[in-house]
Curated annotation (Swiss-Prot):
The name this protein goes by in its record: Phosphatidylinositol 3,4,5-trisphosphate-dependent Rac exchanger 1 protein
Polar residues composition-biased segments: 1030-1047
Gene: Prex1
Higher taxonomy: Eukaryota, Metazoa, Chordata, Craniata, Vertebrata
Pfam families in UniProt: DEP, RhoGEF, SOS1_NGEF_PH
Classification via PROSITE patterns: DEP, DH_1, DH_2, PDZ, PH_DOMAIN
Modified positions (Phosphoserine) in chain numbering: S314, S991, S1186, S1191
PANTHER family, alphabetized: DEP DOMAIN PROTEIN, PHOSPHATIDYLINOSITOL 3,4,5-TRISPHOSPHATE-DEPENDENT RAC EXCHANGER 1 PROTEIN
Region of interest: Disordered: 1-33, 793-813, 1022-1047, 1099-1129
Protein role: Functions as a RAC guanine nucleotide exchange factor (GEF), which activates the Rac proteins by exchanging bound GDP for free GTP. Its activity is synergistically activated by phosphatidylinositol 3,4,5-trisphosphate and the beta gamma subunits of heterotrimeric G protein. May function downstream of heterotrimeric G proteins in neutrophils.
Keywords for this protein: Cell membrane, Cytoplasm, Guanine-nucleotide releasing factor, Membrane, Phosphoprotein, Repeat
Keyword Cytoplasm found: yes
Length: 1650
């Protein structure tokens, strides 16, 4: 046995290979060599003895740790442990008989130490110790057989946060680092140890010469321990793995470094690859283990000697010579495109290859596989190994931090209580140190309360709190010590930053990356060092300087800590070696830059980090549940989920679902990537909860269908021209079954083009139409494309009494038309072939990536043309036309009243007014015409960019290139990370999207993000030459020679409209509207008083008419006004706060739902010193029945006013007088004074002084009412009527004056332009908000994903937030006003226009419409320009999910902000116009930041008010975490925005374009609706969205930091936004020269680049 044993030892132990032959020629080599060999063997034997003793001591220490840290603590806190779920049975299962094992090993260690006393020597004997204890080692049988059960239980317990935290705290107090080895690692150590003994004894036997006294005992001990292990199944399996590793290592000659069995558990992959390094290309055998990659040279067979033949009997019959090893922790892998030949491949052309970078030594080499399949196998294995390692580490770090933070929070609250009084101000030398505690007092207190059981645990806990940033030494000089050293909680000195080095580092890192790459004077750039160029690097000290200059960090130490955090979390690394970040001149590089350098778009898909899965073209269908099912069945066909059948007449068929269509997603779940069984389960779950379905169904842009040509009746309606469109289809008809849907455009009939024809030309091809032209339509329930179409159809039906018939018809008609046999009757009938153009298609791309947590995430990115935007623009134009018509009528009436022209100035004034009124009349006619154009427009469903000026048309009121960019992210919900890491380590991987046998479907997280891109709203119209008179007149008035056309077109509205003029015009309009509403409300109070008096005075004959008709009827002169137009001064609850109650029957028309322009009436109670002060004193007697009445004999003597009626009368009269006071205040104000001044040349009844004196009439009227109350109640109604008549006349005079002033200051030439730009902006805003609203109502919106908040909670929170604080609309402009004249004009236009959006309000109503398919929302416009109200009609399901305030009718306020930054440098001396352009941008940004700050304050108050902190300390910590972290992030972003908007002197140029990503993140976190604009809506805005989406994925969805730019690049060049370029082929929109690096990296390739 000696020869092979020692031979094996030589091969493994002599790196030089010199000792490979001595035994073979032993007799000849002489005594000297033999002695040398013997001495070497004994030296190695001593090493093995030391290892056995050392590892045994460590093992006993581990067992003691498990006993003291876990078992003893659990026993000390029995009640607490049971409450958390650690029952006695659970503890027994987890730890089994580990204490018995400890007792055995204490004795075993004592015996080993006795044998090897005082220090191990090579002559010591050890074999007998093992033989003595071999029977006692049977104690392992129970432990090993229970082990699998224990691990299963641990996974379940780890799902309970309280248990997970308790187990982590046990580990912490025991002094072990919680992130090193998880508990399951410790529980595995007994099995690993018992399996290790045979390996150690085998090594000892090798090194024990035959003549050694211990030789026989060691051989016996080896066999005995093998027998012990083979008797236990679990250890047998473990032994086999370890033996395989040991055997493999024994076949590698010259092995260096630690043994495989010490650091690895299994071989993952092996194979031969070509390795290119240092100019050589060689074949090498590679072995990939967990944690290690080894490569060897194959040793050629040596023939001749007996020993050599034996040594060739190994793996694959060959031997290896060790050539190198790389710890996978410091190894990076990079794919290489086929055909590449570069520096690392030494000029060799690479095929099926990849690069491996040993970052510890900064050495690169290239590997090449024989085939592409083999390459993929290696890359997959390398990535799997990396993900297992990273997810384990990240998960453990996150869990440990949570536990320590919660523990710190709990202890802090306890220490702050008066009983404990540990935290206090303390004296030190001559100073006082505020709010601190002493280390030794802290440890003593922890012992006293039972938090720890011994002093060491207290020190461990203190050190953990210090390392995790919860406490610190008051001078930051000491670690935690159990001494009289002062420490302070960071909460008390404001230095606590929650989790900044863990999760928040992700968003901080992404933010820093974007800012650094947005600089015009880059900090990150290519740098030369020692004749080598390092690409995209930054010296550590330069980065520290920059962080300090920007205010991100206050000290260099803090900046270094941030740099270390960035390196530790995969953002950047040292370019040469794996060293920590230092404040030195060493170079560091962002991983994301490495991913981008030297790559072309072709090799992106081979990367395993972020890859494209599928391109889709689809249509979104909305299918509500029916009584029994959804009306369709699915099947699996070619691994795709396909519609098997659709029920005739079902809601699914009505939505346009057809058999054979592929389904991509159901309610945002990407079912096409799931097994079919799971898809059925998902459908059942949705049906059980009665949820409507949102299906994404594959479709084509154009398709040809065959519609049966029945001679009896048509089952569809066609309208419109060029192209004709399907107006409606009959539900359940054969046309629907054939695939005809409302809204489709008809391009061809039977192969003949009809795209430029009308509906009649299409219908002529159908027999039914030719036979019965007038009555060709069948009896169907019609399904329309939009609600407007449905309304139009109802209106054209004629008399209203026919409507019920229409509803009855379908019920009787449907059975006839839906019968199956009817199909067979017409089997041979003719068909008409229709080629159709589908509208509202969604272009999408599906991507996937592995997140930092090791989960597979899927992203569906889509662009959607906003539905109904043309019709919405038409409705806005109609509202403007109505507004203008009323204005023209009122002004016309006024002009007619004053026909006498006295002076020349009167004549001029009259003439100007006439001209303006004529111009407004032409505008009204145009708006009506444009509205009709837009309503009939169907295709294309969006407006393309146009660079040339053109005659004004309806499309000029619609946004250009407006697309909603949706990003839907889905991934499995995270399980507790310890459990997750367990399943990865031990091979029980849960399916990422699949069925868990214990839980049914794995729960998934779904989130939808929405950003709109568009061209900035603009005015690009030229005066028409050949228009009709109306259009000509309009254009003449807009661009008349007097108006100076060139200057108007060259400059924007903010330049042309003076701020003062805009303000005074708005003031006039607001006053006009306020007067109108105040008068209306006053009349409603009068109505209530009259009604009240009529119920008190029984004899109706004697009572006066309760209410004069003139008081109630609406005056025709008052424009229809949104009664909530000035929302900031209204009470949003929808019910006015009044101080009296009205019965239900009175409520109907009492006007109590009316919203007032004045402040809430709740303060009326404090106004009792008014006219009613006298009556309130006499509240217990009736005025009508009192002795002072004088005419008492006219009344029945028992006439009394009940006390409840008295109170109502008091309230009504008080409100009436308050309203009168309010009207007086409005009429005497400065605005009215200015109006009189402006119109002094127009002859009116009164001057300003005479007008003010009219108030005396109303004072007299009030006195009269007081007298009536006390002396003559019968005349009270007539006194009130007199007062109201006076007030009404007073108000009418005031309104007339305002109308004249308005007419004078209205610039009719600019109003058209304002309307066009405003209309474009409002349409985009409404469509964006509506998409985000629907996402929130479907519980898919989540702007808080990085704080692990569920989409359901985030959506509900956002809905409550907007209901309380309004909607933040964030417009981001990338226009270049300094270099492009047109873009400066655009910016000046939209600055004015967006401020006007704040006057718009949104409200909600329920939609009771079932004759329109695939529409959740439709819009209605009410009000005037100054108080426009958009009403969102929502279907019942979504309406029921609105916050109760919005359901009740309250309106939402808009807060519009515009941040603008040109993507071009402003370095150097500016050209003349540039300075003004830069100042314009700064002014816009400053105003917007102020508005954002106001909104943030409201939001902060809203959340803090709702966050009543729980009493439980653990729950408090979580709650504070959820609140403080987002607030900290918002504070930081706001600070950054201030540095961009108000830069220090001379620093403006050094800030770059960082404002763009920072403002996006700030508004995203505030829950804003985001709209990004550039000159055309094509290039800059779409790239900005790709960047923002990649940043969101990294911040909230675990995209690896190194993949941020890679993801941006793929989404930009291969994502759905390339469709926008395809739709605008002739439009050029290049990126500005000198754009920052961030915006140049991902530009689409120029022609010829690829």
């Amino acid at each position: 046995m000696e020869a092979p044993g020692s031979g094996g030892g030589d091969g493994g132990g002599d790196p030089g290979g010199d000792g490979a032959h001595p035994d073979a020629r032993g007799p000849v080599s002489g005594p000297c060599a033999a002695a040398r060999d013997s001495e070497r063997q004994l030296r190695l034997r001593l090493c093995v003895l030391n290892e056995i003793l050392g590892t045994e001591r460590d093992y006993v220490g581990t067992l003691r740790f498990l006993q003291s840290a876990f078992l003893q603590r659990i026993r000390q806190n029995v009640a607490d442990s049971v409450e958390k779920g650690l029952t006695e049975e659970n503890v027994k299962v987890l730890f089994s008989n580990i204490e018995d094992i400890l007792e055995v090993h204490k004795d075993f260690l004592a015996a080993l130490e006795y044998c090897l006393h005082p220090e191990p020597q090579s002559q010591h004997e050890l074999g007998n110790v093992f033989l003595k204890f071999k029977d006692k080692f049977c104690v392992y049988e129970e432990y090993c057989s229970n082990h699998e059960k224990a691990l299963r239980l641990l996974v379940e317990l780890n799902k309970v946060p309280a248990v997970r935290a308790f187990l982590l705290s046990c580990m912490l107090l025991g002094g072990r680092k919680t992130t090193d080895i998880p508990l399951e690692g410790y529980l595995l150590s007994p099995i690993q140890r018992i399996c290790k003994y045979p390996l150690l004894l085998k090594e000892l036997a090798k090194r024990t010469p035959g003549k050694h006294p211990d030789h026989t005992a060691v051989q016996s001990a080896l066999q005995a321990m093998k027998t012990v292990c083979s008797n236990i199944n679990e250890t047998k399996r473990q032994m086999e793995k370890l033996e395989a590793l040991e055997q493999l290592q024994s076949h590698i000659e010259g092995w260096e470094g630690s043994n495989l069995t010490d650091i690895c558990t299994e071989l993952l992959l092996q194979g031969n690859l070509l390795k290119i390094s240092a100019g050589n290309i060689q074949e090498r055998a590679f072995f990939l283990f967990d944690n290690l990659l080894v490569y060897c040279k194959r040793k050629s067979r040596v023939t001749g000697s007996k020993k050599s033949t034996k040594r060739t009997k190994s793996i694959n019959g060959s031997l290896y010579i060790f050539r190198g090893r790389i710890n996978t922790e410091v190894m990076e892998v990079e794919n290489v495109e086929d055909g590449t030949a570069d520096y690392h491949s030494n000029g060799y052309t690479v095929t099926n290859g990849w690069k491996i970078h040993n970052t510890a030594k900064n050495k690169w080499f290239v590997c090449m596989a024989k085939t592409a399949e083999e390459k993929q196998k290696w890359l997959d294995a390398l990535i799997r190994e990396r993900e297992q390692r990273e997810s384990l580490k990240l998960g453990m770090e996150r869990d440990a931090y949570v536990m320590i933070a919660e523990k710190g929070e709990k202890l802090y609250h306890m220490m702050m209580s008066k009983k404990v009084n540990l935290i206090k101000d303390r004296r030190r030398k001559l100073s006082t140190v505020p709010k601190c505690f002493l280390g030794n007092e802290f440890v003593a207190w922890l012992l006293e309360i039972g938090e720890i059981s011994k002093t060491e645990e207290g020190v461990n806990l203190g050190q953990a709190l210090l390392e995790n940033g919860i406490i610190h030494h008051v001078s930051d000089k000491h670690q935690f010590k159990n001494e009289q050293v002062m420490y302070r909680f960071r909460y008390d000195d404001g230095t606590y930053k929650a989790r900044s080095e863990l999760e928040d580092i992700m968003s901080k890192g992404v933010r820093l990356y974007c800012r650094l790459h947005s600089l015009y004077a880059p900090v990150i750039k290519d740098r030369d060092y020692h004749l080598k160029t390092y690409k995209s690097v930054v010296p550590g000290s330069k980065l520290v300087d920059w962080l300090l200059a920007q205010g991100d960090c206050q000290t260099r130490e803090e900046a270094v800590a941030l740099g270390v955090g960035l390196c530790n979390n995969g953002f950047m690394h040292h370019v040469l070696e794996k060293s920590e970040f230092k404040d030195e001149s060493q170079y560091f590089r962002f991983h994301a830059d490495e991913e981008m350098e030297g790559t072309s778009s072709k090799n992106k898909q081979l990367r395993n980090d972020f890859k494209l899965v599928e391109n889709i073209l689809a249509k979104r269908l909305l299918i509500p549940p029916q009584e029994d099912d959804y009306g369709f069945d699915l099947e699996e066909k070619n691994k795709a989920v396909v519609v098997k059948s659709v029920q005739r007449g079902s809601l699914a068929e009505m939505a346009g679902l057809q058999a054979g269509r592929k389904i991509y997603s159901i309610n945002e779940d990407l079912v096409f990537l799931r097994p079919f069984s799971e898809v059925e389960t998902i459908l059942n779950q949705f049906f059980c909860s009665r949820r409507p379905l949102r299906l994404l169904v594959a479709t084509k842009a154009k398709e040809t269908i065959k519609v049966p040509d029945h001679p009896e009746a048509l089952s569809f309606q066609i309208r419109g021209t060029a192209p004709p469109c399907v107006f409606a289809v009959g539900r359940g008809s054969e046309a629907v079954a054939a695939g005809l849907c409302a809204g489709q455009c008809i391009l061809k009939v039977n192969g003949t083009s009809v795209a430029n024809d009308g509906a009649l030309e299409v219908l002529e091809h159908f027999q039914a139409f030719r036979n019965h032209r007038e009555e060709a339509l069948g009896l169907y329930q019609w399904v329309y494309h939009s609600h407007e179409d449905a309304q139009l159809a109802r209106a054209s039906q004629g008399a209203p009494d026919e409507d019920p018939q229409e509803d009855d018809q379908p019920d009787s008609a449907l059975p006839l038309l839906s019968l199956g046999p009817q199909l067979s009757l017409h089997e041979d009938s003719a068909v008409v072939s229709l080629t159709l153009d589908n509208v509202h298609l969604e272009h999408g791309v599906v991507y996937e990536y592995m997140s930092t947590a090791g989960a597979k995430c899927h992203v569906l990115e889509k662009i959607v043309e906003p539905r109904g935007c043309f019709r919405l623009a038409a409705k806005i134009l109609e509202a403007f036309a109505v507004d203008d018509s009323i204005f023209v009528q009122n002004c016309g009436r006024l002009m007619a009243m004053s026909s006498a022209i006295v002076t020349m100035s009167h004549y001029e004034f009259h003439n100007i007014c006439d001209t303006k009124l004529e111009s407004i009349g032409q505008r009204i006619a145009c708006y009506q015409e444009f509205a009709a154009q837009l309503k009939s427009r169907v295709s294309p469903p969006f407006k393309q960019a146009s660079l040339e000026p053109h005659p004004l048309c309806g499309l000029d009121f619609c946004p250009t290139n407006c697309h909603v960019n949706l990003m839907e992210v889905s991934y499995p919900k995270t399980t507790p990370s310890v459990g997750r890491s367990f399943s990865i380590r031990f091979g029980r991987k849960p399916s990422l999207i699949g069925l868990d046998p214990e839980q049914g479907l794995n729960p998934m997280a779904y989130t939808q993000h929405c950003i709109t891109t568009m061209a900035a709203p603009s005015w690009k119209c030229s005066p028409a030459v050949d228009e009709d008179s109306q259009g000509q007149g309009l254009n003449d008035s807009s661009y008349g020679s007097a108006s100076g056309a060139p200057s108007q077109q060259d400059r924007g509205l903010s330049f042309l409209l003076k701020q003062e003029d805009r303000e005074i015009q708005d003031a006039y309009l607001q006053l006009f509207t306020k007067l109108d509403v105040a008068l209306k409300e006053m009349k409603q109070y009068v109505t209530q008083i009259n009604r009240l008096l009529s119920t008190i005075t029984e004899p109706t004959s004697a009572a006066p008419a309760p209410c004069d008709p003139s008081l109630v009827e609406e005056t025709s002169s008052s424009p229809p006004v949104s009664e909530e137009s000035e929302v900031d001064r209204t009470d949003h609850s929808g019910i006015k706060k009044v101080c009296f109650k009205v019965s239900e029957d009175e409520q109907e028309d009492s006007g109590h739902d009316t919203m007032s322009y004045r402040d809430s009436y709740s303060e009326c109670n404090s106004n009792r010193d008014s006219v009613l002060s006298y009556t309130s004193v006499r509240s217990n007697s009736s005025y009508l029945g009192s002795d002072e009445m004088g005419s008492g004999d006219e009344l029945p003597c028992d006439m009394r006013i009940p006390s409840d009626k008295q109170d109502k009368l008091h309230g009504c009269l008080e409100h009436l007088f308050n309203q009168v006071d309010s009207i007086h205040a409005l009429l005497k104000g400065p605005v009215m004074s200015r109006a009189f001044e402006e119109t002094r040349h127009f002859p009116m009844k009164h001057s300003w002084q005479e007008f003010k004196q009219k108030e005396e009439c109303t004072v007299r009227g009030r006195n009269l009412i007081q007298i009536s109350i006390q002396e003559d109640p019968w005349n009270l109604p007539s006194s009130i009527r007199t007062l109201v008549d006076n007030i009404q006349q007073y108000v009418e005079d005031g309104k007339n004056q305002l109308l004249l002033a308005l007419l004078k200051c209205t610039d009719t030439e600019l109003q058209l332009r304002r309307d066009a730009v405003f209309c474009q902006a409002l349409v985009a805003a409404v469509c964006t908000f509506s998409e985000q609203l629907l996402a929130a109502l479907d519980y898919r919106y989540n702007n808080n994903g990085e704080y692990e908040e569920s989409s359901r909670d985030a959506s509900r929170k956002w809905l409550e937030q907007v209901a309380a604080t309004g909607v933040l609309l964030h417009w981001q402009s990338l226009l270049a006003p300094a270099s492009v004249k047109e873009e400066r004009t655009m910016l000046e236009d939209i600055w004015v226009t967006l401020s006007e959006l704040d006057n718009v309000t949104f409200s909600f109503k329920q939609l009771d419409e079932n004759s329109v398919a695939n529409t959740n929302v439709f819009y209605h416009i009410e009000g005037s320009r100054q108080a426009l109200k958009v009403v969102f009609y929502l279907d019942g399901f979504h309406f029921s999910r609105l916050p109760s305030r919005l359901e009740g009718g309250a309106s939402l306020r808009l807060h519009t902000v515009l941040f603008t930054k040109a993507l071009e440098s402003v370095e150097g001396p500016p050209p003349p116009g540039n300075q003004a352009a830069e100042e314009l941008q700064q002014e816009i940004n400053a105003q917007s930041l102020e508005k954002v700050q106001q909104y943030y304050r409201k939001l902060r108050a809203f959340y803090l008010e709702r966050s009543n902190l729980p009493t439980d300390a653990g729950a408090t910590a979580v709650k504070i975490d959820q609140l403080i972290r987002p607030i900290n992030a918002l504070d930081e972003l706001y600070r950054l925005m201030k540095t961009f908007v108000h830069p220090k002197a001379g620093a403006a140029g050094s800030l770059g374009a960082g404002l763009i990503p920072v403002s996006s993140e700030l508004c995203y976190r505030l829950g804003a609706c985001q709209i990004t604009m550039c000159g055309t809506g094509m290039q800059r805005s779409t790239l900005s969205v790709s960047l923002e989406q990649a940043a969101i994925l990294a911040r909230s969805h675990g995209l690896l930091p190194k993949c941020v730019m890679q993801a941006t690049d793929i989404m930009r060049k291969q994502g759905p936004r390339v469709e926008i370029l395809a739709k605008n082929l002739r439009i050029k929109d290049p990126m500005p020269q000198g754009a920052p690096r961030l915006y140049q990296l991902c530009q689409p390739p120029v022609d010829g680049d690829l």
